[in-house]
Amino acid sequence: MSDRGKCQYPDDVDVIREREYPLLKDTTYLDHAGTTLYAKSLIESFSRDLTSNLYGNPHSMSAPSQLSTQRVDDIRLRALRFFSADPEEFDLVFVANATAAIKLVADSFRESTPQGFWYGYHVDSHTSLVGARELAGIGSRCFVTDAEVESWISQLDTEPVQGPRLFAYPAQSNMNGRRFPRGWCGRIRESAKDTYTLLDVASLVSTSPFDLSDASAAPDFAVLSFYKIFGFPDLGALIVRKSAGHIFDKRKFFGGGTVDMVLTQGTQWHAKKQSSIHERLEDGTLPFHNIIALGSAFDTHERLFGSMDNISSHTRFLAKRLYDRMTTLRHYNGESVCHVYKPSHSDYTDPSTQGPILAFNLRSSQGAWIGKSEVEKMASVRNIQIRSGTLCNPGGTAASLNWSGADMLRHFGAGMRCGDDHDIMDGRPTGILRVSLGAMSNLTDIDTFMGFIEEFYVEKSPNVCALVPPLEANLTHRSGFHVESLSVYPIKSCGAFKVPDGKRWEIRREGLVWDREWCLIHQGTGTALNQKRYPRMALIRPFIDLSHGVLRVTCGSIRSPSQKTLEIPLDRENSNLTTTSLCQNSSKPSTVCGDQVIVQAYSSPTVSAFFSDFLGVPCTLARFPPQSSTRLAEPRRGLGSRKSPLRPAMPGAFPQDTPTPEAERNPILLSNESPILLISRSSVNRLNETIKSSPTTTNSTGRKKAVAADVFRANIVVAEDFPQPVSAGRPYIEDHWESLRIGPDNLHFNVLGSCQRCQMVCVDQLTGVRGEEPYSTLAKTRKSGNKIYFGRHLAISSNGDGNSVNSRTVMVGDVVTPSYYGP
């Protein structure tokens, strides 16, 4: 197995994957630092255990309870031995996760003395280690470099001691896999009294052995999460060096199972259990089923992989292969594609300095940074799972990106938040992309990921074609356009209602009447649901029945005999259908596209059950309040807007950056960004030609299929007056439109900019199935400034057509007359 490194698994890793990890069949999973994956046989083994044995609450004395106690004791000892920890020197406390273990230690230090404790932590720490500083009454310090830590250790014996000191750092950075000196723990203990170490080993233990056989060199406290190692169960541990156990003596809170006696009347007194550290700290009933599952996890892990040394060797080989390929990848002009964040002293062949994690960003041939969110979205479309952002490592990320504290505060003031898509600020990335490997990773994962980078982000020649092709001199004088179709989306992110041919439809400043007036909100969070997360929403199909004054909603396939129907009154005052009437007192905040919006939720259980049962999500219908509460669209700055990123490459193609106030803030209901979205049939046709001519991906079979225009969820589809042949069309000419007039009344519309696209366009609106097109092709053909564009945002003008607001209508077949950006 020379081509696969020094892997010594009992079976070939590809055989193990096929048998034990069927969910990896069509997925490339590269986020093992978040959690690794559980084996099929682990779940089967645990299931057999639960169905073969009766387990009771460990705090009882019955036979089932004593069986639980016995299993918990055995597995606790096995966990200690897994880390080569002598039970005479160490104890293991079961907790929810590594963060819970950190908090338990920090809380206990805070209560250990009246003045509290001093806390130091390395800048490359996980957020949870940083958070412990808020409990340090004496003060805290962030060590920015290893040299600062070394200097501090050398002076420990000369520093005045005001109380206990705790120094925390990761054994391995969860951001870039860099490994830290294990010797700090023993040296700190030797250098000063009343100074303790807290080692976060959660990232390390997923792919590497953690050896506590030398208690004198071990940390006083080590924290970890078992799901990082086994994928399941969701359980954590705090490993305590018994000589440091007195830190918990002053802990005030006590829970069930941690005391021998409690007086509740008269004198308030209790006696803590003293037989072990874990008995004093494991408050309440243990998650004994999870602990029992841990026993199955140990068995399965050893059977599949042999040892942690085997996993370390395997992942080290893969990480080195990936690192070499990423760092040698070049654009046509020799510029690097991948900027990898790795300390100069770390080496992917040396397990003492580096783990199997790669933190990086991508750059264009001209050195421009490529947005992390766009890369992650594109990877997700290709079923490649990676991580992006600050990676729960704020200090390490900021240091790698050279952001100061003042910079970060400025970004926060500008709206940047954890998990958002503010990818580039002040010309620099705000976050990092991360790929992390695990025990079941293989060379195919590496090849697939690198193929993805090469396909979408390696420039093989200069890009001489403008995204918006220049207008030909006579192009604007050729035949005109007409409205091919009109679509209203009454319920946000659900199916479309097609306006019938010959029916004139009212249009207001907020958009087409009834468009995005309703939404589905999660009953727990209040967040508006969308197809990105729930693609089956495409199968919720509303029909606007004006003659009966109802919104008629059906769910499921169009020809399904089991289709159910729900009717909602269009009139807010209509009380005929009491089971579906709007509850006027149910106004509640909801999050729509990042905005906090007040909506009115339907309180009827019938309404909630109708949607919840179909989607499998606890949700209900909500309606946007009357127009007095209308939202305002943010000004668009996309492709072809008045401030186009293409203007430097196309001088004179667009007017000056002087948007009108009307174009800046337009009223909308529950639409994402603007009142109206328009696309061109010619552009859809050209896109489909490109899709069908492109090669299929590794995971695809057969020829790529064209996509329907419906996937773009436009309100207006315009077509040219001579649809045949397709080659005679003018694709993407709408990118040059500044405004347009529609219909016999010459309704005037301002073009606000181009529509930025996300992976929601990959949801087939007829089946609710998510694919990879058209987003994959759009990413190659319609990208500008790290964003992908298709379609145009519109808003009806408040003047210029000579009609009152109430009489404005549009219809399929109406003539469309565009105005073009001037020279």
UniProtKB/Swiss-Prot annotation:
Pfam families referenced in this protein's UniProt entry, alphabetically: Aminotran_5, MOSC, MOSC_N
Needed cofactors: pyridoxal 5'-phosphate
Family matches, as InterPro entries: Aminotrans_V_dom, MoCF_Sase_C, MoCo_sulfurase, MOCOS_middle, PyrdxlP-dep_Trfase, PyrdxlP-dep_Trfase_major
GO MF, one annotated term: molybdenum ion binding
Region entry Disordered, spans: 628-667
Matches recorded under SUPFAM superfamilies: MOSC N-terminal domain-like, PLP-dependent transferases
Post-translational modification N6-(pyridoxal phosphate)lysine, affected residues: K228
Record's signal peptide: none
Top-level taxon in the UniProt lineage: Eukaryota
UniProt keywords, alphabetically: Molybdenum cofactor biosynthesis, Pyridoxal phosphate, Transferase
Transferase listed as a keyword: yes
PANTHER family: MITOCHONDRIAL AMIDOXIME REDUCING COMPONENT 1 (PTHR14237:SF19), MOLYBDOPTERIN COFACTOR SULFURASE MOSC (PTHR14237)
Known role: Sulfurates the molybdenum cofactor. Sulfation of molybdenum is essential for xanthine dehydrogenase (XDH) and aldehyde oxidase (ADO) enzymes in which molybdenum cofactor is liganded by 1 oxygen and 1 sulfur atom in active form.
Identification of the protein by name: Molybdenum cofactor sulfurase
Organism encoding this protein: Aspergillus niger (strain ATCC MYA-4892 / CBS 513.88 / FGSC A1513)
Gene: hxB
